[in-house]
Amino acid sequence: MARPDDEVGPAVAPGHPLGKGYLPVPKGAPDGEARLVPQNGPEALNGGPGLGPLIAGAQGGPQALIAAEEETQARLLPAGDGEDVPCPACPPRTALSPRRFVVLLIFSLYSLVNAFQWIQYSSISNVFEDFYEVSPLHINWLSMVYMVAYVPLIFPATWLLDTRGLRLTALLGSGLNCLGAWVKCGSVQRHLFWVTMLGQILCSVAQVFILGLPSPVASVWFGPKEVSTACATAVLGNQLGTAVGFLLPPVLVPALGTQNSTGLLAHTQNNTDLLAHNINTMFYGTAFISTFLFFLTIIAFKEKPPLPPSQAQAVLRDSPPEEYSYKSSIWNLCRNIPFVLLLVSYGIMTGAFYSISTLLNQIILTYYVGEEVNAGRIGLTLVVAGMVGSILCGLWLDYTKTYKQTTLIVYVLSFIGMLIFTFTLNLGYIIVVFFTGGILGFFMTGYLPLGFEFAVEITYPESEGMSSGLLNTAAQILGIFFTLAQGKITTDYNSPEAGNIFLCAWMFVGIILTALIKSDLRRHNINTGLTNIDVKAVPVDSRVDPKPKVMVSIQSESSL
């Protein structure tokens, strides 16, 4: 029997009933003239066009009668040009492109550099405070500008992704990242803090075109058995950049001189020149790498593979472009209660991670004076452990498809990890902080791809870029709030524990919201055939593509 998700269905064996939603088509009828019509529609009830006495319509629905097996054959017509041949002779509808690994690697690398530029100031905040002669709040804003820029720009960036595609979005992200890196190279003088801020603003705009791409890249290029792992790998690139941002700056730009009575570093002229040289080395190295990756993006990053990698992507490709509405997509997501709950809970978790990452150097140095290098290494441990968690979570999702259960368990374990990290900071053993930071990072950072993939599942067939963009918007807004609030609480009470407890309270709220999410795995149901698909429209002649297209309505009948 022909199936709705087949591009070219096999002929129905004589004497067997037709599939739901299909009418028999006379053998030899031209593909461009025959149509798929709605079940219970007027043409279906009247026997369909051009079928004459072959079909008798009853009041309860059309009854397909094959008058002569030699003369008539029931089949599902192909979406484009094709011959009436059995399914085994047809080309496969879906296929995996070897280029998918190249695209994923390029994206992960320039995402890595962008994340490195985000955290490179905060990981040695005391050094930059003294070099530019500014307050800790100024350095914190070099991190928070990433969050501020994201909120107003995510909607035009998402519109661009949905209307112009992956390639242009990738070029903008990589290009602006490169431009920002070069601007910073001109800021290595003590009175040019505003120039380094300008470069950071450009990098923060680039981030808008980067953070929302893991899910679209994974969905467009990877098959259903590897999509979660691919998304986790794409997120991994960003996490690795954060890890490198904690590791390299303390090594490339070590603190020089001795502290004076104000707590700032007292520099001689020679020390200042050496510090400027070290900062220059870091900035120029970043700029050269960013330039190389930008040219690599131009050469090798393609829009999409020749054939869709999954049935879910094939259905979306068959939908005519006229059917997509940006405003309707936003409205549909806002009315999706499970997505709204995930939106807030994801924002809490990721915002807490942003706050911890931004303030980690200040938190560690409160208890362990002079341990700038180890503070960076603790940040590295936190992120590397999270990278391992991300990959394991992605593999687990591809194997089990237990999105809600996994998300909830990881959320609870992140909360427990945060409590352990908070109440072991003041023990006086920095090795303990390494260990507890690793536990915290494994679960907190490992949660990030879970949120992306869970959102795509419960919002399909809405744009992956839209759902990812809204998740990141919530994360940026709450990241700004948490960073400012935690920083002030830590300063007022002179205790990082108070600020961490503030984050723990919010994470507990996130656990409750996650538990309330209804798990309706729409994309998974399409790929496994658990969702009822009714072909309910005739082929559409698009102004863009002259080939007929089939419009599909998805009706989910199960909630896993």
From Swiss-Prot:
Residue segments, region Disordered: 1-43
Give me the segments passing through the membrane: 93-117, 136-163, 166-185, 193-221, 227-252, 271-300, 337-367, 372-400, 403-425, 429-458, 467-492, 496-518
User: Which residues get glycosylated?
Assistant: N270
GO MF assignments: choline transmembrane transporter activity; ethanolamine transmembrane transporter activity; heme B transmembrane transporter activity; heme transmembrane transporter activity
Q: Which BP terms from GO are recorded? A: blood vessel development; embryonic digit morphogenesis; embryonic skeletal system morphogenesis; erythrocyte differentiation; erythrocyte maturation; head morphogenesis; heme B biosynthetic process; heme export
Q: Which UniProt keywords apply?
A: Cell membrane, Erythrocyte maturation, Glycoprotein, Membrane, Mitochondrion, Phosphoprotein, Receptor, Transmembrane, Transmembrane helix, Transport
Which residues get modified to Phosphoserine? S542
Q: What does this protein do?
A: Uniporter that mediates the transport of extracellular choline and ethanolamine into cells, thereby playing a key role in phospholipid biosynthesis. Choline and ethanolamine are the precursors of phosphatidylcholine and phosphatidylethanolamine, respectively, the two most abundant phospholipids. Transport is not coupled with proton transport and is exclusively driven by the choline (or ethanolamine) gradient across the plasma membrane. Also acts as a heme b transporter that mediates heme efflux from the cytoplasm to the extracellular compartment.
Q: What is the official name of this protein in its record?
A: Choline/ethanolamine transporter FLVCR1
- This chain's source organism reads Mus musculus
